[in-house]
């Protein structure tokens, strides 16, 4: 889930060239840094990357295009090196550094826009569910009935921002049939954020969470997110978020390290597992204050 996550900053400009889909033009590639499991190259208005995972993903992206879903990559085909070609989403990426310090990430406008974007995505995806259930996906289906296609990692660091607001979402490698609420837990966790620190609006800095000072504001923002999505705040939203962090953030990092995955081993060495374990303990201690 987290292992091998792509970073967003540019590394170098490579002078490799390739033909575009029409075969009529050569474009230079700019390699994106940070993808230890997959190199990603930008060329003009397209992104070229090694194909990851299941064949259903391309069908899903084509379906979203047919449904007119804006702000997601379009699948354009396969290049001569066997890499998938996707449209590039212009804008700025934020939130990969935790804690997120950019003021726009803590604004009500951003939070509401995230909720509305996820609702549009889930509504557009729901019609693909009957076909999707015929395929094998990278992530297992949930035990409960599926109601949409989950992005699988809809955290703020996978959104594209313009003018301080989220306008696009990329990295659909973890997409799978699932439930809307399960998919929303990652957005909720990363956007509030549901962590042991909080954003001080007066100082515009992060500080330690205080139940007396911060519980009401955190509750307000959680309810704002779900209201913007178009549903009442589910009573089990914090419980599901804790389960998601335990299973996908902590569990898969441990499993990957045990299997020798160098990226997971590095992330644990850097303290990321310890961080998410603290987040999990924080949710279990204080989550009841926010619903």
Positions of PLM-derived features:
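A conserved alpha-helical element in kinase catalytic cores
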Residues: 36-37, 44-124, 128
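ATP/Mg2+ or Mg2+-diphosphate-binding catalytic cores
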Residues: 249-291
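Active-site activation/catalytic loop segments of kinase-like enzymes and analogous catalytic loops
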Residues: 184-231, 246-260
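Conserved kinase catalytic-core helix
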Residues: 99-135, 147-152, 157, 168, ...
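ATP-binding glycine-rich phosphate-binding loop
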Residues: 16-43, 52-54
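Active-site acidic catalytic loop and adjacent metal/ATP-binding pocket
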Residues: 38-42, 139-185, 193-196
């Amino acid at each position: 889930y987290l292992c091998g996550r792509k970073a967003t900053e540019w590394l170098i400009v490579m002078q490799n060239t390739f033909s575009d889909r029409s075969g009529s033009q050569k474009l230079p590639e700019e390699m994106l840094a940070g993808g230890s499991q997959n190199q990603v190259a930008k060329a003009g208005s397209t992104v070229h990357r090694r194909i990851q995972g299941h064949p259903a993903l391309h069908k899903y992206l084509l379906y979203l295009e047919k449904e007119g879903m804006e702000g997601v990559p379009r699948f354009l085909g396969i290049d001569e090196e066997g890499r998938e070609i996707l449209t590039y989403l212009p804008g700025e990426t934020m939130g990969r550094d935790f804690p997120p310090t950019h003021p726009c990430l803590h604004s009500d406008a951003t939070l509401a826009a995230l909720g509305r974007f996820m609702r549009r995505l889930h509504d557009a995806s729901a019609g693909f569910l009957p076909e999707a259930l015929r395929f094998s996906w990278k992530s297992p289906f949930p035990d409960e009935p599926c109601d949409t296609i989950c992005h699988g990692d809809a955290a703020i660091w996978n959104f594209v921002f313009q003018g301080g607001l989220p306008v696009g979402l990329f990295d659909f490698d973890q997409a799978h049939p699932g439930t809307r609420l399960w998919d929303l837990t990652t957005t909720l966790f990363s956007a509030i954020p549901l962590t042991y620190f909080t954003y001080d609006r007066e100082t515009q800095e992060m500080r330690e969470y205080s139940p007396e000072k911060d519980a009401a504001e955190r509750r307000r923002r959680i309810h704002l997110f779900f209201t913007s999505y178009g549903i009442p705040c589910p009573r089990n939203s914090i419980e599901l978020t804790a389960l998601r962090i335990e299973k996908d953030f902590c569990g898969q990092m441990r499993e990957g390290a045990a299997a020798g995955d160098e990226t997971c081993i590095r992330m644990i060495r850097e303290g990321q597992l310890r961080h998410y374990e603290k987040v999990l303990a924080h949710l279990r201690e204080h989550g009841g204050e926010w619903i």
